[in-house]
């Protein structure tokens, strides 16, 4: 007799068992950052911030970065197929008093195009 093994019981929903998109991005960024910090420490480069190390990892040290909304306000649009670079934002305190670093989704100048003036 075959037994049907259900991974979820009736009180567990899909969202409780799989991380949200933001949780995935946070885990991904944390993993990259931890690796970069370990490599920087081993190389004696301890004065660099996480975001400076990420810029080096992305090979965009001197690039100009802005959010989608900021580029839009400047009259530019993100080119089709471009994906945002992940960076850590400034520390924020939630309504419950929890302090955390938000994720910033930034695009560099090479990823945008300014609208043509007619």
Tell me the role of every PLM-derived stretch:
Residues 2-118:
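N-terminal accessory/interface modules of nucleic-acid-binding and processing proteins
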């Amino acid at each position: 007799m075959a037994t049907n093994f259900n991974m979820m019981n009736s009180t567990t929903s899909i969202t409780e068992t799989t991380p949200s998109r933001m949780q995935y991005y946070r885990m991904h960024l944390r993993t990259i950052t931890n690796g970069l910090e370990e490599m920087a420490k081993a190389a004696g480069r301890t004065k660099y911030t996480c975001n400076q190390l990420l810029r080096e990892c992305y090979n965009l040290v001197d690039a100009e970065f802005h959010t989608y909304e900021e580029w839009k306000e400047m009259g530019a649009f993100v080119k089709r197929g471009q994906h945002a670079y992940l960076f850590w934002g400034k520390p924020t305190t939630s309504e419950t008093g929890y302090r955390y670093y938000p994720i910033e989704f930034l695009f560099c100048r090479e990823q945008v195009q300014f609208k043509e003036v007619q």
